[in-house]
Design a protein with these regions (language model features):
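Class II aminoacyl-tRNA synthetase catalytic cores and aaRS-like
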Residues: 1-155
Length: 155
């Protein structure tokens, strides 16, 4: 049975396991006969490596993936010292769930400054940036802890 998981839950101990990861195509690098797609979800990211000589059909499909498209990749986890997080997916299946508008109003993967009005008009994209997301995540955890403390102390 295929195990649907978050990228952050895939570790070296999963080497050889088949998993399914869904998320945004955060970064795409095409090096001729090999394409790397970094898939980002709410927990982290993992790299999928598509090789033309391994599966021409999957390689062709990977060529159609655009930045911030929502994808689902099923594949075997392989330990790799060169991949981000020291693990990568050797894909068996790739599904493009949803295509992003092109061109993107903001680039989530790069450190490009945008003016405030652009960021506010495209807040859904702005919140995907790790620095912006972490502020709201921290606030949420802080509020949760405060609420728990008040409950435990009878307030």
């Amino acid at each position: 049975m295929i195990n649907r998981t978050h990228a952050s839950d895939v570790g070296p101990e999963d080497d050889g396991e088949t998993v399914e990861v869904s998320g945004w195509a955060h970064e795409i690098r095409d090096l001729g006969g090999i394409t790397f797609i970094v898939i980002r979800d709410r927990g982290g990211s993992i790299q999928a490596t598509f090789k033309e000589d391994r599966s021409p059909e999957l390689f062709e499909k990977a060529q159609q993936v655009g930045k911030e498209d929502v994808v689902t990749v099923t594949g075997e986890v392989e330990e790799s010292g060169q991949a981000p997080g020291d693990r990568e997916l050797v894909p068996e299946n790739l599904e493009i769930v949803s295509e992003a508008e092109s061109p993107l109003p903001l680039d989530v993967s790069k450190d490009i400054d945008s003016d405030l009005s652009t960021r506010l008009d495209n807040r859904f994209m702005d919140l995907r940036q790790p620095e912006v997301h972490s502020v709201f995540s921290l606030r949420s955890h802080l509020m949760e802890s405060m609420e728990e403390w008040f409950d435990e102390n009878g307030y």
